[in-house]
Amino acid sequence: MKFGKRIKEQIQESLPEWRDKFLRYKELKNLISSPAPVESIFVGLLNAEIDKFNAFFVEQEEDFIIHHKELQYRIQRLVEKCGHNDEMSRENISEIRKDIVNFHGEMVLLVNYSNINYTGLAKILKKYDKRTRGGLRSPFIQKVLHQPFFKTDLVSRLVREWETTMDAVDPVKVAEAEGYERCAAVTSAAAGEGIFRNTVAALLTMKEMRRGSSTYSAFSLPPLNISDSDNVLRSLHLSSPIPIP
């Protein structure tokens, strides 16, 4: 699949409020196709895009850190209260389970956001160099590697932590740990289909982009720093609303 089509589909699959935060790949491609693309205009547009990526990524990352702490507190309270009021425990476990799955999904989407925008920059720079016979790509990508939106280590670590937590908050496991038999009857709540679909699409896109080239280069994406997508999907304890290859 050509990248232009891939990023268009990814934007459509993304959360509505995220859709104007992605790389304006088609606009940049059209600029390159003009009779005499001006480097200063092209670089100015790229820098504006990077500023947009950084602002959005940092804002999301900060929100995730806050949400991470809030969810940890809620889980601690849930474990303390489990069994004292069975009906309340049942509702609380169901609610927090859904919140965790949604939170995990949003973080996966942010990692994918970083990946696909970086890939788009590398590809559009390659097209520019080919069109102008220039050498802009290599020095520009070196700058990109130090941008906040490219540094996904923190978010990837939180993704892995919450994959583990999703198992720990499995109602059956909570019941076994706390010794409350009635809590074991509580089933996991299904997360919203929309966020689940978006997360699945993001995971598959990340795998596809890394599979797209058989050779490693300075412009290749780093290894995927979250669990294999198939394992992530299984860890959700949910039936996928769309087929998973």
Curated annotation (Swiss-Prot):
Role, per record: Plays a positive role in plant adaptation to phosphate starvation and exerts negative feedback regulation of SPX1.
InterPro entries xrefs: SPX_dom, SPX_prot
Natural source organism: Arabidopsis thaliana
Tree of life domain: Eukaryota
Induction / repression: Up-regulated under phosphate starvation.
Name of the featured protein: SPX domain-containing protein 3
UniProt gene name: SPX3
Residue ranges of domain SPX in the record: 1-142
One of the GO BP terms on file: positive regulation of cellular response to phosphate starvation
CDD domains in UniProt: SPX_AtSPX1_like (cd14481)
